[in-house]
A protein has these predicted regions:
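Conserved acidic carboxylate
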Residues: 10
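Aromatic pocket-lining residues of Rossmann-like dinucleotide-binding sites
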Residues: 23
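Conserved acid/base catalytic micro-environments in cytosolic active-site loops
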Residues: 2-4, 14-20, 28, 39-40, ...
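Glycine-rich phosphate/oxyanion-binding loops and their immediately adjacent helices
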Residues: 36
């Protein structure tokens, strides 16, 4: 079996050694190289042609943001941003340049190590395309007539999103007007500690009111509610947000099925469900109910 070839990029020797040690426990993965800064990473990608790159953000010589931009413009490869919770906002800038996903730097505990390895295996199989300068042309947003909203106030859009989702959301949401006539609720698979950073990043590029869903929020037209990763999100019969505790057995966080199923129960045929990107089967049951 062909092994997954990984390039590890981090200015911290200790961090590189930890990531390499974790990856080396899986016989399907081979670390083919390491780099201590973005400039070296760009060169190593060109030389080694890895299947996937783990990329730190804050580094000397060339930071991770610029390295991602250069790599995706010349030798496109799946990139997983590996950073700290404090770097959440900066990390999402990396997504806009073409990185596929982000995770918190793994610890030595077995659960985090297994999750990290699973993410590497998943992302390494995704086909990526050249991402010139990490920029897109966003179409001009035209606000909808206010009279429209009175006709469809009972409708809702529910989005299930996984790997590659933040990048896709950064394309879709900016094209919606600030008076979008119904609420949008989103369950995005994401590591704990990064939801607030994603929300702040999306606020910069869209006219919509975007927030992390909170217990008791009344869902309203023109607003986007993104589920926190620490709990699952439901819409209750009063059309308010209810947050549900995660269970140890839960594989996905937050759960797309939980959100979509609750939306189907409350809104019935006035709900629009969207599977934006997928990982495993999460969302399949919920979208069937919608």
């Amino acid at each position: 079996m062909k092994k997954i070839r990984v390039l590890v990029v981090d200015d911290s020797t200790l961090a590189r050694e930890l990531i390499i040690a974790i990856l080396s426990t899986d016989n399907e993965i081979q670390v083919v190289g390491e780099a201590k800064d973005g400039k070296e990473a760009v060169e190593k990608v060109r030389e080694l042609r890895p299947d996937i790159v783990t990329m730190d953000i804050e580094m000397p010589v060339m930071d991770g943001i610029e390295a991602i931009e250069q790599i995706m413009a010349s030798n496109a490869v799946p990139i997983l941003v590996v950073t700290t919770r404090g770097d959440a906002h900066t990390a999402y800038a990396a997504i806009s340049k073409g990185a596929l996903d982000l995770v918190v730097k793994p610890d030595v505990n077995l659960t985090e190590a297994k999750e990290f390895i699973s993410r590497i295996k998943l992302l390494s199989g995704i086909k990526v395309i050249t991402h010139i300068s990490g920029k897109r042309k966003i179409q001009k947003v035209i606000d909808m007539p206010t009279s429209v909203s009175t006709e469809i106030g009972d409708k809702i859009v529910a989005i299930a999103s996984s790997t590659g989702g933040p990048d896709a959301l950064s394309v879709i949401l900016p094209q919606l007007p600030k008076n979008f006539p119904c609420p949008i609720v989103i369950a995005q698979h994401i590591s704990d500690g990064f939801v607030s950073g994603m929300v702040e990043w999306l606020k910069l590029i869209t006219k919509l009111n975007i927030k992390v869903a909170a217990e008791g929020d009344v869902v309203s037209a023109g607003s986007v509610y993104i589920s926190p990763s620490e709990r699952h999100t439901e819409i209750n019969i009063s059309k308010r947000i209810s947050l549900v505790d995660r269970q140890p057995k839960d594989v996905y966080r937050p759960s797309c099925d939980v959100l979509l199923s609750s939306v189907a129960s409350v809104y019935g045929n006035k709900a629009l469900g969207v599977i934006l990107t997928g990982m495993g089967s999460d969302g399949a049951l919920g979208i069937q109910r919608i």
